[in-house]
Amino acid sequence: MLLNILDIQAKKGLEKIACLTAYTFPMARILDEHCDLILVGDSVGQTVYGMESTLSVTLDMMIAHGKAVVKARSKALVVVDMPFASYYTPELAYKNASRILSETGCDAVKLEGGVCVAEEIAFLVARGIPVMGHVGLMPQHFNQLGGYKCQGKTDSSRQHIKEDAKAVCEAGAFCVVLECISPSLAAELTQELPVPTIGIGASNACDGQILVVDDMLGQSSRYPKFVKRFADLEHTIKDAVVGYVRAVKCSEFPGDEHCYSDGPHLRVFRAHPHHAQ
């Protein structure tokens, strides 16, 4: 049964909400069985396309990856990030968010920002588009924030984040991501806000957690401090590639068990030449 935003909200204070990012059909199919929420994050720009930041990610890219993820899910709620500069007015936000929902079949969109995007969030929610908020460290704002740094360390910054989170909730966001803020601030916001908080580098005090799946799986040697690597796929993949190349060079692969024999199997192969492509 597909989860909806009410199911996610009902977990607040009762059951931790497990979230991960996904950008492809195979990965989403694996995550769907276990995760409550899958985010098609604009982090795809860095993890898949090798971009320096999320600022170059386009709406078409998000829609393409959103389609792939939605096709794989049978249970998890799917949220798609709205990319940089795609929601700087209420009308533009609605135009792009409605396209994301209609073309991907996802359940909600995510916007970064607090007070500055409250009007856009309210505009979308009033027109039937569920919104996930995102405050604290906001990757689309990294130039203004002076880089990827923990936020809320000063009294003024702490107050600013609290105002942002409150504005997002009052505008109608069904949950809010808290990124790279202190544990005490995360605990305070989780207690005060009426909607679930999803932490990333924001301590275990939040109602749920999210990580970039590539970081969690250890597919890169570079990852933030707040990431726990539950696997080491970078070395697993390297070992597999080395083994494959060695087997090819030594003529150990393909073996007889990987080859077609004369007879019916050969006729099938010739009738379906696309198998060789």
Swiss-Prot record:
It is found in: Cytoplasm. Pathway: Cofactor biosynthesis; (R)-pantothenate biosynthesis; (R)-pantoate from 3-methyl-2-oxobutanoate: step 1/2. It comes from Anaplasma marginale (strain St. Maries). The keyword Nucleotide-binding does not apply. It catalyses: 3-methyl-2-oxobutanoate + (6R)-5,10-methylene-5,6,7,8-tetrahydrofolate + H2O = 2-dehydropantoate + (6S)-5,6,7,8-tetrahydrofolate. This is 3-methyl-2-oxobutanoate hydroxymethyltransferase. Its cofactor is Mg(2+). The keyword Cytoplasm applies. Pfam families: Pantoate_transf. Mg(2+) binds at D42, D81, E112. Binds 1 Mg(2+) ion per subunit.
